[in-house]
Amino acid sequence: MRFVLDTSIFVNPEIRRKFGDNPTEAMRTFLGYAEMLFGRVEFYMPPGIYREVMHFVDEDELLPEIELYIIKKPPNVHDIKIPAFVVYELIDDIRRRIDKGLRVAEKAVRESVIETDNVDRIIQKLRRNYRKALREGIVDSKEDFELILLAKELDATIVSADVGILTWAQKMGIKWIDAANFREVLEGLVAKMGEGKNL
């Protein structure tokens, strides 16, 4: 059994809380599960995701376990085939998002003409809504794309709370687990292993 891990498990406060009060504590708790499952379950991170996580944790507190239990592997970008429909969907999605972003900008301009004394507030609202229109639900970074490609290559399960990653995992037929449920999944795997059941 293989899992490809996203940063959201350790960084997103709502998700991380199940593992610990801060990213280092959350990673330490996860590594405890990884140790119990060692040899039966593999945990992967693409290098970009690993670097992101390392910005948030105290690496010295997690050595050597973090090196033992998390496999850092880039996807083989030269050999992975992506179906043409994925590119079509991506282009269509980007076009819809650009149009939606344009409507958000137009609305902000109209509001600023009416409320000239609240321009800063309107700009803040524009940025928030524009970001939401363009980025929510889409793979918006190279690191996110590497995560998806690696899971595809390994036939692994993605663990993430990122809506864009999970949406594209579904579109590409990749198994996934919402990071909000990951601790319970790990506990279930440890229990099955303790009972001598196959994973």
From Swiss-Prot:
PANTHER family reported for this sequence: RNA-FREE RIBONUCLEASE P, UPF0278 PROTEIN TK1425
Function: RNA-free RNase P that catalyzes the removal of the 5'-leader sequence from pre-tRNA to produce the mature 5'-terminus.
Organism: Thermococcus onnurineus (strain NA1)
The UniProt record lists the keyword Transport: no
Lineage: Archaea, Methanobacteriati, Methanobacteriota, Thermococci, Thermococcales
Protein name per UniProt: RNA-free ribonuclease P
Enzyme class: hydrolase
GO-annotated biological processes: tRNA 5'-leader removal
UniProt entry keywords in alphabetical sequence: Endonuclease, Hydrolase, Nuclease, tRNA processing
Listed EC numbers: 3.1.26.5
Record-linked InterPro entries: PIN-like_dom_sf, RNA_free_RNase_P
Catalyses which reaction(s): Endonucleolytic cleavage of RNA, removing 5'-extranucleotides from tRNA precursor
Family annotation (SUPFAM superfamilies): PIN domain-like
Family assignment from sequence similarity: Belongs to the HARP family.
GO molecular function: ribonuclease P activity
